[in-house]
Amino acid sequence: MINIRPDEISNIIRQQIESYDQEVQIDNVGTVLQIGDGIARVYGLEQVMAGELLEFDDSTVGIALNLENDNVGAVLMGPGLGILEGSAVRSTGKIAQVPVGDAFLGRVVNSLAKPIDGKGDIPASETRLVESMAPGIITRKSVCEPVQTGITAIDSMIPIGRGQRELIIGDRQTGKTSVAIDTIINQKTEDVICVYVAIGQKASSVAGVVSTLEDKGALGYTIIVAANADEPATLQYIAPYTGAALAEYFMYKGKATVIVYDDLTKQASAYRQMSLLLRRPPGREAYPGDVFYLHSRLLERAAKLSDALGGGSMTALPIIETQAGDVSAYIPTNVISITDGQIFLSGDLFNSGIRPAINVGISVSRVGSAAQTKAMKQVAGKLKLELAQFAELEAFSQFASDLDAATQAELARGVRLREMLKQKQNSPISVEEQVAIIYAGINGYLDTIPVSEVKGFVEKLRSYLRNSAPQFISSIQSEKKLSPENEELLKKILTDLKG
């Protein structure tokens, strides 16, 4: 017969009573009323927040965007093929967050910061809100350090500073992405973290960018966020904010970062698609009323932080595609008004062989001149003036048959300056070499060289400076100005090369 010990049984019962958890878990559950086109109408989610993540039966995640009297309009962040009318939906109580960390460098991720490059999982050190607040007035500092793009025309006449928002705008196939990629490649020696966000692009284009960065040794300090053209509109809409969250992680660690949004026209189109399907009232060009806020809250996250916060920075290079050069359309005017200047790329210049096809006349940098190095300022002022005069004379000379010698000389110099500013794709030039090249152009050293040989002379000068006069480059790097001694040395080099 088994010996039953009542005290042991009572102890076990007592322990079970004590360990019994009386806490009730309350789930906010709703039902799918309607599903289609990446939009779900959900009934019964009474306690849901705007922007809250929702979980559907098939594990698809959605975002609650429209909170209406009798239902909630949610956008899906996936195909949602397993969602049916009547399926259950659970609110998560969370706002969209993405993992961030140093391990993301050199990787290609999707809009939710999940790896898509086949190199395995990415260990994340923390998470950040996709839609986080932009730095306030007190936490910012004015732009004071340069971001060198390696493109002579930009670094001299449209300078960009750390923490600036500089728009790259132009028609399709005018070299907008090339300008951004050259800027990323040029950060190799600058200790700058780069984030490239591809929105609504062909997967082949993104693969091309990845291989270019890899070939140039720039992928190691770059993160690529890709929301390809075949992905749901929600993921194309959210991709820039994910890129900004990844860049902010480094910015708040005191690092300088550059983020490229390629391009915001496609993000606005994705947002328009979502808004119209959610039956929000359309405005100008059928965009919703808050499309300005869509871009302003994104671009305001770019900043140069105060020294108290580590002095980090996020420089934003948004790209906008225009139709037939029309910068007065809705989205271009919005983004021009938000940013601190724009680089305008012209299809006519591109087709006439001037590459990068920068229209210097209507391109501007509103705050970058404060960050420009003294050496560049010494030569850039005259370059801008001479090119402006040349543009005016060139237009005038088309109607005049006989021109005096001074005008002809000015036109000849202008043609050579324009030739001097042409540059190959993916081959950025250091700022020290740029100073020497511009000095040669504005001081007449190219005037007697045939136009077809200007490029060759520029290459010869760069090669000579690197191999035979490294003291000139190191002196400008340390002093940041063109001293009288350096000027004499440069004059001697230019005279020798011409002779």
Curated annotation (Swiss-Prot):
Coiled coil location: none
Family: Belongs to the ATPase alpha/beta chains family.
Origin species: Emiliania huxleyi (Coccolithophore)
Catalyses which reaction(s): ATP + H2O + 4 H(+)(in) = ADP + phosphate + 5 H(+)(out)
UniProt keyword Metal-binding present: no
Protein name as annotated: ATP synthase subunit alpha, chloroplastic
Domain of life: Eukaryota
Binding site for ATP: G170, D171, R172, Q173, T174, G175, K176, T177
Pfam families found in the cross-reference section: ATP-synt_ab, ATP-synt_ab_C, ATP-synt_ab_N
PANTHER family: ATP SYNTHASE SUBUNIT ALPHA, MITOCHONDRIAL
Main location: plastid
Compartments where found: Plastid, Chloroplast thylakoid membrane
